[in-house]
Each structure stands twice: as structure tokens, then as C-alpha cells.
């Protein structure tokens, strides 16, 4: 999982990526291509 400062660029890497909020943190999840997962620090 990649740790990034801005999730805007992480979301635009794949069309299926979506932003979710869990436990006060923002995550990018991608069901079709899980290597695009990211979390905002």
C-alpha cells in the first residue's frame, strides 16, 4: 500500500479507484487492480 500526501493523484491512476474513509483516515481502494491501494497520512 502506498502512503501519499494527496489522494487526488492516487485516485486518477485507475478508473475503478474509489476513496473511502475508515477510522479517520482516507483510503483509495481498487477492486480490479489492488496494487493501486493507497492511504493518506
UniProtKB/Swiss-Prot annotation:
Domain of life: Bacteria
GO cellular component: ribonucleoprotein complex; ribosome
Gene Ontology terms for molecular function: structural constituent of ribosome
Coiled coil: none
Cysteines paired by S-S bonds: none
Pfam family, any one: Ribosomal_L36
InterPro entries, sorted: Ribosomal_bL36, Ribosomal_bL36_sp, Ribosomal_L36_bact
Alphabetically ordered keywords of this record: Ribonucleoprotein, Ribosomal protein
Family of this protein: Belongs to the bacterial ribosomal protein bL36 family.
Protein name from the UniProt record: Large ribosomal subunit protein bL36B
Amino acid at each position: 500500500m502506498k502512503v501519499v500526501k494527496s489522494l487526488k493523484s492516487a485516485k486518477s491512476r485507475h478508473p475503478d479507484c474509489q476513496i473511502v474513509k475508515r477510522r479517520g483516515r482516507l483510503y483509495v481502494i481498487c477492486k480490479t487492480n489492488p496494487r493501486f491501494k493507497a492511504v493518506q497520512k
